[in-house]
Regions:
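Membrane-interface interhelical linkers
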Residues: 1-12, 16-36, 40-71, 81-91, ...
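Hydrophobic/aromatic residues within transmembrane alpha-helices
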Residues: 28, 37, 41, 87, ...
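Hydrophobic core positions of alpha-helical segments in small-molecule transporters
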Residues: 13, 40-41, 72, 99-102, ...
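Hydrophobic/small/kink-forming positions within alpha-helical transmembrane segments
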Residues: 19, 50, 74-78, 104-109, ...
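Hydrophobic residues within membrane-embedded alpha-helical segments of Major Facilitator Superfamily
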Residues: 10, 17, 24, 44, ...
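Alpha-helical transmembrane segments of compact multi-pass small-molecule transporters, enriched
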Residues: 44-48, 99-113, 128, 190-195, ...
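Residues that define the loop-to-transmembrane-helix transition and helix capping
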Residues: 35, 94, 120, 182-183, ...
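Loop-to-transmembrane alpha-helix entry segments
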Residues: 63-67, 100, 111-136, 140, ...
Length: 294
């Protein structure tokens, strides 16, 4: 089995894990602020990864990749995840994950500028389909009710999350050259956690952030979500980014809606409209073109 094919499987596995993780966090998100969710997720993820690396062994990391991974962690976790959780509290799960389809487009453009990747004409067609599908998904008029009032800020936080995460992926690609995906995941989480720790200390909110974990049922559900996104979401995504071109890896990560839409219907009893489903289908066609022809 080639490294390229394994990278593709890793990207698809990461997409599936993020779909499950998003729905798990959606179910408990009302109990935590976005900053609290990012802080606790990073803390628990670090403990899990430390245990695995303690058993598997740790290779020394040079200062060059360490600096890039530190910046990637702060941008993608401290900022990107906080924006993501803020959007998650304001948007239906299926709508948010379709918005996340913008990530491969933004990342591809950044890869074009900063990594020298050059997609073929068919790749630009894929970009158009992704943008068209996402636009179609948000074609419906937002009603001026309480839920609608929350969707405007939700869209803003979602876009900010896409920008932060796309930038962090480009930076991570540079730092991954001489570091294993598992160690890179640990380092990114470490620096992301450090950023959140500083925020919590400055705002004197650490106790408030951790308070909901006193509920045993909530604590175990949160831990399950963290296990899924740490090993399935974070680690597999970095493995894919290490093995594949950034544009291909991130486009495959955008297949998350394939898993999220049916899960949202079954699990959260949400009802995506026909327009959302068609938009997701068009966007995923574009994602497929980018993945296999970009």
């Amino acid at each position: 089995m080639s490294a390229h094919f394994i990278g593709i499987l890793a990207a698809l596995g990461s997409a599936a894990s993020w779909a499950v993780g998003t729905l798990l966090f959606k179910g408990i998100g009302e109990e935590f602020s976005p900053l609290a969710m990012t802080f606790i997720k990073s803390l628990l993820g670090l403990l899990l990864l430390a245990g695995v690396l303690g058993l598997a062994g740790w290779e020394p990391v040079k200062s060059f990749p360490l600096g890039w991974l530190a910046l990637s962690g702060f941008l993608g976790i401290s900022l990107g995840d906080s924006f993501f959780f803020a959007a998650l509290r304001r948007l239906p799960a299926h709508r948010l994950v379709i918005l996340m389809l913008l990530a491969p487009v933004v990342t591809l453009l950044m890869a074009l500028c900063f990594l020298g990747e050059r997609p073929a004409i068919i790749g630009w067609i894929g970009i158009g389909l992704v943008l068209g599908g996402v636009s179609l998904t948000f074609k419906e008029k937002i009603q001026a009710d309480e839920a609608g009032d929350r969707r405007g800020p939700g869209l803003l936080f979602g876009v900010l999350s896409v920008l932060a995460m796309a930038g962090s992926v480009i930076i991570a690609k540079i730092g991954l050259q001489d570091v294993s995906a598992m160690e890179a995941t640990f380092l990114r989480l470490s620096f992301g956690f450090a950023g959140m720790l500083v925020v919590g200390l400055v705002r004197a909110e650490l106790g408030h952030w951790l308070a909901p974990l006193r509920q045993a049922g909530l604590r175990w559900r949160f831990l399950l979500a963290v296990i899924v996104v740490t090993f399935g979401g974070f680690w597999l995504s970095l493995y894919a980014i290490k093995r594949l071109d950034v544009s291909i890896a991130n486009t495959l990560l955008a297949t998350e809606p394939v898993f999220a839409l049916p899960l949202a219907v079954i699990w959260l009893k949400e009802h995506p409209t026909a327009t959302s489903i068609v938009g997701a289908g068009i966007a995923l066609c574009g994602a497929g073109i980018l993945a296999f022809n970009g």
